[in-house]
């Protein structure tokens, strides 16, 4: 933990950082596109799209893949319902015990002890994610056992790479103090771009992308 001692605030993405979503969100994206087009994009198709840095939202990524494939594109609300059916396999706002979707196939990439160690080192931490709130709360609170973790999820702020959510949570955790350093740990081009935009909007703060 000493290597991170200079980090006053450490913010995490969730998908691809806290949990592996290759068999859940990515799979739901593939199945959704296949449902509407008969074509199932492979991992490289999705990676190329994500590498553009503008498709952090998997619903919009699904729609964009369908547009580029040609043919009819469904209504966004209808696509979201179909996607959620694959991912949650039940009511997103309902009892997670009744979910039967791909969300059950998400290996954790960290252990709860990590956050105890961060707190013990005086590092303030939280999560900025494009995940739906029920999904984010499920992994953080039920699977990791974190109590009311600082979180910005889908709908709390504009989608990344807009830095609003990142800046907002950093300000909340700073609590009026000037941070020594703010690091954001993500896994996509959109996450890096979010930090770049945060630097432009708050150049007085020391932003770092991990």
For the regions a language model picked out, list residue spans one by one:
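N-terminal helical cap/lid subdomain that shapes the substrate entry/recognition surface
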Residues: 5-12, 18-109, 134
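Acidic, Mg2+-coordinating phosphoryl-transfer loop and its flanking beta/alpha structural elements
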Residues: 184-210
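Substrate-recognition element of Asp-dependent hydrolases with the DxDx(T/V) motif
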Residues: 17, 29, 103, 111-142, ...
